[in-house]
Amino acid sequence: TRDPGIKTTGPGYIRKHGEVVGIAVAVDGWEGYYPIAHETPPNMDKELVTRWLRKQCSYESVNYIFHNAFYDVGWLTTMDIDIKGKIIDTLIAAPIVDENRFRFDLNLLAKDYLKESKSETQLREAAKMWGLDPKADLWKLPASHVGEYAEQDAAVTLRLWHHLKKEIAGQNLINI
């Protein structure tokens, strides 16, 4: 997202300031990134991607997995995308598994539970080359430098959910 002021005034979707610049999705065995509003082209047709995503989110029988769903779903709402299925948030599920953790960020959870981490090397190198902050200015980079990172984000979230789901069942926490 392009979300100026998030650290000082909160998420832009509430203030109607900012926009979604790309959509990362993952299913078992595949992940993809659809750039729609990066400052530096090329981007895909925003309306075409939005229509496709709206259709994908219209299935009531599908579980939609997020890490920090409150944020992502808030931005999807600004695109008139309504998720019809069940929303599952790994940021909520992780403390159910271990409420004594100090941090629940995606990278740390992936490292601890999946023994993997997202590679930010390419993203950081590209940001440095462009003179940008790799996270705050991600939207200014061409999608070719962001896509792999965004795809990893979606894929790791899905794998983390598979792990947490087993833990929740194994600890008999399903009804919590």
Regions found by a protein language model. Name each.
Residues 1-18:
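Entry/capping segment at the start of metal-dependent catalytic domains
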